[in-house]
Regions:
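Gly/Pro/Ser/Thr-rich low-complexity, intrinsically disordered segments predominantly at protein N-termini
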Residues: 1-178
Length: 178
């Protein structure tokens, strides 16, 4: 039987937790669980890390009533994603978020993969989803989530100031991208 013909055993979030508990996966392994399949994430480079650091500093000050989480799990239908940043309502320490006010993916080489996540974030009720395309110096902003995806998608470039739905201070694209 060819692999393409064989049934696939899909993992659950609980399966992955047991794998971590057994030492099969390490907590620091960079994976996402998409439709029950573990997907390796690209290791962050210098540009990616600098952009995430800038956004983290900005969001902590701009959204004081929320938690800013960096590369943490967001539970979604069929698994979990690990966005670069998310702004969530405060939760008890033993709970992972299943939605967010804002999710940001910083893309240096992963633009196409990050674009495929939009429908998952919309179905999870994420109010805003941003894809920061570092090489293109643009930010694609998705708003108005629904079952079929986001109803409003706009692209912003150098010189733009993007308001944050939960924040008090807009993001200056030029300052963010250096």
């Amino acid at each position: 039987m060819l692999c393409a013909e064989a049934p696939i055993h899909r993992l659950s979030v609980e399966d992955v937790r047991r794998m971590v508990d057994a030492g099969v996966l390490l907590e620091e392994d960079r994976v996402e669980l998409v439709d029950g399949v573990l997907v390796d994430m690209t290791p962050p480079g210098a540009e990616h890390s600098a952009t995430v650091a800038w956004l983290t500093r900005h969001l902590v000050g701009a959204a004081p009533r929320h938690e800013v989480r960096v590369q943490d799990l967001l539970l979604v239908e069929g698994g979990f994603l690990m966005p670069d940043l998310m702004v969530v309502d405060p939760l008890p320490r033993d709970r992972q978020p299943s939605t967010a006010a804002l999710v940001i993916e910083v893309s240096v080489t992963t633009q196409r993969y990050d674009a495929t996540k939009a429908s998952r974030y919309a179905r999870a009720g994420v109010s805003e989803y941003w894809i920061v395309d570092v090489p293109a110096r643009t930010v694609q902003v998705h708003r108005r989530p629904g079952p079929a995806g986001y109803g409003d998608i706009a692209r912003h470039g150098d010189g733009a100031r993007i308001p944050i739905g939960v924040g008090t201070s807009p993001v200056d694209v030029s300052a963010m991208l250096g």
